[in-house]
Amino acid sequence: MGKPFSKELEKISNTLKWSFEQSTDSLRKAILDDKKPLVIIGSGGSLSACHFLVLLYQQYGVIAKAITPLDLHYSQQILRESNILFVSASGKNNDILFSYKTAVNCEPHRLLSICMKPKSPLEKLSERVSTSFHFSYNLPTGSDGFLATNSLVAFFGLLAKALDLKQDLIFESKTDENINHFKNLTREFFNKVSPDFTFLVLHAGWCQPIAVDLESKLAEAALGDVLISDYRNFGHGRHHWLDKRGVKSCIVALVTPDEKEIAIKTFKLLPTETPILFIETDKTGPEGSIDLLIKSFVFVEALGQSQGIDPGKPGVPGYGRQLYHLNYQSIYLKSDKKSEKQKRVSIIRKSKASVFNDLSNEEQIYWTSSYDKFTSTLQKATFGSVILDYDGTICSAKNRFGDMDYEVIPYLTTLLSNGFVLGIATGRGKSVKKALRDAIPAKFWPQIIIGYYNCTEVGLLNDNSTPNKELQINKGLKDIHELLVSYNFPVEITFELKPSQLTIQIKEREKWEKVRDSIIQLIMLKNPENIQILESSHSMDIIDHSVTNKLNIKSYCQKAAENLGKENDCLFIGDKGQWPGNDYQLLSEPHSLSVDDVSPLNESCWNIAAPSIKNVDATIYYLSCLEYKPNHIKFKLK
């Protein structure tokens, strides 16, 4: 098992160059679009990349934490309000796959993963999750030997390129001369130490991921005892090791220009007989980390040679392989039935708890009873129509300027072919009409009712007279439009004024929070009459509250269903059930389901989809639960 370490190091320079040539725009966007606390998970050598990513991410003012897969199991309370990112070279070890499944059940905001092997089991897992963003790279060097080498350099390079704050990262290895000089230093150092020495690795700042990696490599390849500490924590008692065990101890000092002064001051106070090796770089920030990582590999290679051990193939005992492949999931898996798990995650969404056990006994009883009553009532009801929101419900963010998701179309045509009514309640206008006409056969158009501009206007899909933009524009909306257009915002904003609605959009969605509060403040200072602010998954709508209500579509659908000889009750599905979400009225009805945000009310607007299944995927799940009878539709949980 393994590969010669020296052969692995020969490929490092090309691997680094390769990593900087890869496209990382999508990776950067996925990580930074929704800046929440970030929990980063990795095992073995990949954990070093996790610590590097912590430093990169925290440059943007948000906390991050690197943990192992087992740590994740004991950290479930923090996952729901965080983003999660998995780092794995192969994407197939038991630990990473089990922890990924655990994270899915905790419903983090985003579930990201990055892997150096396409079509891995990790990638296949991610394809089942609505909130997942998976990034596969095809590392030219293939799998590493026993220790993480080229995959680790590739992770460092890709992550640095994606997240470097200055976005001007250029790494040029100096190289041979620089590395040869360092090799000479290591030879001198190993003349002073022996295999039974303890290595005290001191670090700070961008050196920290390298300290983590040195501890990992020296322990995994059995090259030496390692103690790691930052320069100042070393002064809080850890220095005592040198006093009692200094004869068999040495120091490995990781130094960038930022640590040089603190290192010099520290070592002036230590016994002069203590051997010290400086692994040093003249680079700062992410570049400094990468330079130190490569030099640390040279140190590991030299340490192995001094002991007659090849770090890339040190020899692994049988029990080591058994430990690596240990099947331990049953220890941590709960035996709850699928229905119980679904009930608990639905209650967590409603109650805003981090985990179910955060609720008191009284709260658990209250919400369990509410869930049982809601689902029982839902499954007893008989429907003649289904009313859907558009954006975030049947049209995902990736298609927000185009058509609805193709996966949902067969479910809609099934509903229509069974003779029932489909309602679409949207904040948009004619673009939705076009999308529906493009997707659904014309013979079904008379069964489709559209509520345009948050249902200010309602008409059939085959009606060419709606929406009518010739209607008189509300004066209050016109005044707000003029105010916002004249204001100097820090990013580009687009405004579309309609008779009873002003739609506000921003091209770069990740910058929305920079202007959202300013827009609301300006509108509220105007103190307009009958004006309300609503938000969808892709825009903000300022509406004339006196004529706009998404429930305006309900009576149209009921009448159409009755005319077809169907029951007149409606099933409502949307994504923004909590005000200012633009479905808060639509999902206030008793038989209403959310595919994302829920309201706090216990008798409506439940999200009962599986963990981490949301938006269009959740809509598809709900539609798959429909059972069609001659004159009504039943909803059956599965």
What residue spans do the PLM features occupy?
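Active-site phosphate/pyrophosphate-binding segments
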Residues: G2-K36, S130-K248, R321-K341
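Catalytic-core regions built around general acid/base machinery
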Residues: A30-D33, S99-A103, F189, D403-G419
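Active-site phosphate-binding/coordination module
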Residues: R128, D403-K498
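Mg2+-dependent phosphoryl-transfer enzymes with acidic/Ser/Thr/Gly-rich catalytic loops
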Residues: E340-T368, A381, I553-K638
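Conserved acidic, metal-coordinating active-site core of Asp-based
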Residues: Y487-L571, K576-L586, P590
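Asp-based phosphoryl-transfer active-site loop
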Residues: Q379-G402, D583
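Phosphate-moiety recognition in structured ligand-binding domains
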Residues: G2-K11, S113, R128-S130, V247-S346
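Glycine-rich phosphate-binding loops that contact phosphosugars or nucleotide phosphates
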Residues: D25, I31-D176, A204, R245-D282
